[in-house]
A protein has these predicted regions:
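N-terminal segments that cap or nucleate solenoid repeat domains
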Residues: 1-51
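Ankyrin repeat domain, specifically the short helix-to-loop turn at the C-terminus of the second helix
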Residues: 21-29, 57-65, 91-104, 131-139, ...
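Ankyrin repeat boundary/linker residues
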Residues: 35-36, 69-70, 109-110, 133, ...
Length: 191
């Protein structure tokens, strides 16, 4: 990735006397699709550092970056959810509504089988959990490769507010047995 573009994403710099994001991304069709050695796009970098205005501008110019995955198959939504950047999550979800990709993005899994909700629960970011569940309350949020559902992760870690939110808001939460055939109820009791 162009170091100037990376630095701008890291700092959330949409434009100053030396740099203008729109000009930089529009100058070359490939600019928006440049990646870091880990496969992160400029949108991933903005999500990592919590720059919602920068993310919004990137998506206006290159909306296809919304569903791009890095080398760990993470989208920018996975990264923002993991870091607890609520405003970035809001921007990404708003863009999904504009481009009719809501279900696709919220249901995408990374290399471990985690959705963005798995990441938000594991990192204990309640505001992000609420946004994600509200955005796609019809989804069952199946287990990841370790057999953990978001409901199981919330129960196992004692993240009671997330547990309650998932149970109250998610129309069909997955109660499947997790690791060692323990259900979310087992995990809550053991915790």
């Amino acid at each position: 990735m162009d170091p100037i573009l990376y630095s701008a994403a890291m700092r959330g710099n949409i434009g100053d006397y030396n740099f203008l994001l729109a000009d930089h991304l529009k100058r070359d069709e490939e600019n928006g699709y440049q990646v870091t050695p880990k496969g992160n796009t400029v949108l991933h970098v903005a999500a990592l550092y919590g720059h919602s205005d920068f993310a919004r501008e990137v998506l206006k110019i290159t909306p296809a970056l919304l569903c791009c995955q890095n080398k760990k198959n993470e989208t920018a939504l996975h990264i923002a959810a993991n870091e607890g950047h609520t405003e970035v999550v809001r921007v990404l979800l708003a863009c999904t509504r504009d481009h009719n990709t809501k279900e696709k993005l919220t249901r995408m899994t990374d290399a471990s089988g985690d959705t963005a909700l798995h990441k938000a629960v594991r990192s204990q970011h309640l505001d992000v959990v609420k946004l994600l569940v509200e955005e796609d309350s019809e989804f069952e949020y199946p287990p990841n490769h370790a057999q953990e559902t978001p409901l199981y992760l919330a129960a196992e870690s004692g993240f009671h507010d997330a547990l309650i939110n998932i149970l109250e808001s998610c129309k069909k939460p997955t109660y499947a047995a997790g690791p060692s055939n323990r259900t979310p109820l087992h995990a809550a009791v053991i915790q």
